[in-house]
């Protein structure tokens, strides 16, 4: 009795809510064996035939390829695609693909050479001798993807299962009307399918392996039972025919009684599902060493004269397959890729066959019926009763039309499997699946944009944080350098302070002039020569400055007066005039004032900075030079004394010179002269006294 209950519990199946029973229409194509189709002259192989990114190209235009040669490299979810036959790559360009929008995707276009030569194939007949990782990598690199319609990379799916998979389910339900590709494959290749299932079981190591098949496929059931007669590791479960029992979540619930949670995956409850076509492709990749280059495609509908299932090479144009099946198009003929409920209408027939293409339906006008006008929703809830995912299609319809994305997401629109059961039962002929597809696409686009914005924000915040860290580190370095200067900086500071103190000491040192001594004026002379050179350079740089000198220059007048006096004295000496009186001190003072005025005016004209105060030692040197010149002039002109100079006349000339100097300073807008230095006055007085004494002595000598 216990064994009886165990057997009953072991073979128990469950049911799911909703579902419909549309006309099956499978007998048109499942009665004839699989057949080969002649090679097309040209193949179009899209680089993306799966869920995920397209692979990296590894061929170029003009390359010759063999059947099974990789056209792209697969990394991660980037599944590679392979050449369906031997030939030459004539173009790599966008081409319309198998998609409801008929968007153009990058494709490799190959002209077949008709030889259909394979690459060198290396099969692993003893696959158990290889590791799990090696088997998964081989399956991935040979381009195996889910052939049931989703197109998810099989290697990635097996890798993600890991050790948490307890049940492996092989989906053989094929519940949609018209499609018989899996049915015919199980009838003709049951042994190869079972071998592929065992390879998958070897990789996953589940506790049980279940094959779910609907009871409307008696021939396929018989073939599988014959192959599994002596097998105890694989169980065959026959389930009632009901659409959409072939859905992943629905078949999982039927065979295990477990429901996949909202937003979750079947692996969350320890279940992994593969299609029978995928199991066959796994066997060919591992045991035979053949990448996936072809698949079974159902050609059916009343518009074709020879319906059936064919081995179609990937990249073959749809037009080529339909013509081989005797396609007789009508005026408004449509061609559907997929089934009547989940398929989509092709915009033209140059679309290529891809890995997820399982059926090409060419119905007649009578078969499809007259087009129905879309009407308003009457809230009958028939769609909710038929929904196998326990959703509320009528609410999702309103949310989709109103662009209420948040509410549509809250009502689990992502769980919609787009089976079309709701649209099938809708009395208002509302294409609900089209609304749901568009809404899900918009939600995905919004999420993608939000993800990109979040990534951009993260990058910006990371950059700001990095800049703040660099700024803080820079300030810390500057602060540390200011608090603790380097040794060489301290030495430089000490040297600068020493120079400043030395200059201050020199400035405060009094000037002492000893009678009869000759001071060392070499430094002063060198500085004066440097200033003269600087003044000459400035005059050369500003040649126009000389032209601005007014005609009544006091210094010029003084020079002319001095020249005139010298000429007069020379004339008197030649004529034998009276002896020259002693040099008047006031005249010497006048000459010194004139010299200072000339220096200030020269500095104003050249735009230089104000002159430094006159050094007493400099005045002494100039006086000594003047005396030497006077003595030399007297020696040259003879011993006769010159006519004495009138003191009042010299005073008047000095006053006139001072008045002209002050007037010139006012006209030029210069700053007032600095007050006379007491030391300078003392020096000038001493010089005058010395000159007077010397003149008196000279006069006495002349009289003697």
UniProtKB/Swiss-Prot annotation:
Membrane topology value: Peripheral membrane protein
Role description: Part of a membrane-bound complex that couples electron transfer with translocation of ions across the membrane. Required to maintain the reduced state of SoxR.
Quaternary structure and partners: The complex is composed of six subunits: RsxA, RsxB, RsxC, RsxD, RsxE and RsxG.
One GO molecular-function entry: metal ion binding
Keyword Signal included in the entry's annotation: no
Positions that bind [4Fe-4S] cluster 2: 387, 416, 419, 422
Compositionally biased region (Low complexity): 556-565
Protein name: Ion-translocating oxidoreductase complex subunit C
GO biological process: electron transport chain
Record-listed E.C. numbers: 7.-.-.-
Main location: membrane
């Amino acid at each position: 009795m216990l064994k009886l209950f165990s057997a009953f519990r072991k073979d128990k199946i469950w049911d799911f809510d909703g579902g419909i029973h549309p006309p099956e229409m499978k007998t048109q194509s499942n009665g004839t064996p699989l057949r080969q189709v002649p090679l097309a002259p040209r193949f179009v192989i899209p680089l993306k035939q799966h869920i995920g990114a397209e692979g990296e190209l590894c061929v170029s235009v003009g390359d010759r390829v063999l059947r099974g040669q990789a056209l792209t490299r697969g990394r991660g979810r980037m599944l590679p695609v392979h050449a369906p036959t031997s030939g030459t790559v004539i173009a790599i360009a966008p081409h319309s693909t198998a998609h409801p929008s008929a968007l153009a995707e990058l494709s490799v276009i190959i002209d077949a050479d008709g030889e259909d030569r394979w690459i060198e194939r290396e099969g692993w007949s003893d696959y158990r001798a290889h590791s799990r990782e090696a088997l998964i990598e081989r399956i991935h690199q040979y381009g195996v993807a889910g052939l049931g319609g989703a197109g998810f990379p099989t290697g990635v799916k097996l890798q993600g299962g890991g050790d948490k998979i307890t049940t492996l389910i092989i989906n053989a339900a094929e519940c949609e009307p018209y499609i018989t590709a899996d049915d015919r494959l199980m009838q003709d290749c049951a042994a190869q399918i079972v071998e592929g299932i065992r390879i998958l079981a070897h990789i996953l190591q589940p506790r049980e392996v279940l094959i779910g098949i609907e009871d409307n496929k008696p021939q396929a059931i018989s073939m599988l039972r014959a192959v599994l007669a002596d097998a105890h590791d694989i169980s065959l479960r026959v389930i009632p025919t009901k659409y959409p029992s072939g859905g992943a979540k629905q078949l999982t619930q039927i065979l295990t009684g477990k429901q996949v949670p909202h937003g979750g995956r079947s692996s969350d409850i320890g279940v992994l599902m593969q299609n029978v076509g995928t199991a066959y492709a796994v066997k060919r990749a591992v045991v035979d060493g053949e990448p996936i280059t072809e698949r079974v495609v159902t050609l059916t509908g009343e518009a074709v004269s020879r319906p059936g299932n064919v081995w179609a090479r990937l990249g073959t144009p749809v037009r080529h397959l339909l013509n081989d099946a005797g396609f007789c198009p009508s005026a408004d003929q449509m061609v559907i890729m997929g089934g009547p409920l989940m398929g989509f209408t092709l915009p033209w027939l140059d679309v290529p066959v891809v890995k997820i293409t399982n059926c090409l339906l060419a119905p007649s006008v009578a078969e499809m019926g007259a087009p129905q006008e879309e009407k308003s929703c009457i809230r009958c809830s028939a769609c909710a009763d038929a929904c196998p995912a326990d959703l509320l299609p009528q609410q999702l319809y309103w949310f989709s039309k109103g662009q209420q994305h948040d509410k549509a997401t809250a009502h689990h629109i992502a769980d919609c499997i787009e089976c079309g059961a709701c649209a099938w039962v809708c009395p208002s002929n509302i294409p609900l699946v089209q609304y749901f597809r568009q809404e899900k696409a918009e939600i995905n686009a919004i999420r993608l944009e939000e993800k990109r914005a979040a990534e951009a924000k993260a990058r910006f915040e990371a950059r700001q944080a990095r800049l703040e860290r660099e700024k803080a580190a820079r300030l810390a370095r500057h602060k540390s350098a200011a608090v603790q200067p380097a040794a060489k900086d301290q030495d430089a500071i000490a040297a600068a302070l020493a120079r400043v103190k030395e200059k201050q000491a020199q400035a405060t040192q009094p000037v002492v002039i000893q009678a009869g001594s000759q001071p060392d004026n070499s430094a002063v002379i060198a500085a004066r020569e440097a200033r003269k050179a600087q003044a000459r350079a400035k005059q050369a740089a500003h040649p126009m400055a000389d032209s601005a000198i007014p005609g009544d220059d006091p210094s010029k007048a003084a020079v002319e007066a001095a020249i005139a006096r010298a000429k007069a004295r020379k004339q008197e000496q030649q004529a034998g005039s009276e002896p020259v009186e002693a040099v008047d001190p006031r005249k010497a003072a006048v000459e010194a004032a004139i010299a200072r005025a000339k220096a200030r005016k020269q500095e104003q004209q050249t735009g230089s900075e104000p002159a430094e105060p006159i050094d007493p030692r400099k005045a002494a040197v100039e006086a000594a030079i003047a005396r030497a010149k006077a003595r030399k002039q007297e020696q040259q002109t003879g011993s006769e004394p010159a006519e004495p100079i009138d003191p009042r006349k010299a005073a008047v000339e000095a006053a006139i010179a001072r008045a002209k100097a002050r007037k010139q300073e006012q006209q030029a807008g210069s700053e007032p002269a600095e007050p006379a230095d007491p030391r300078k006055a003392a020096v000038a007085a001493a010089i005058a006294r010395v000159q007077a004494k010397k003149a008196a002595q000279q006069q006495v000598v002349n009289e003697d």
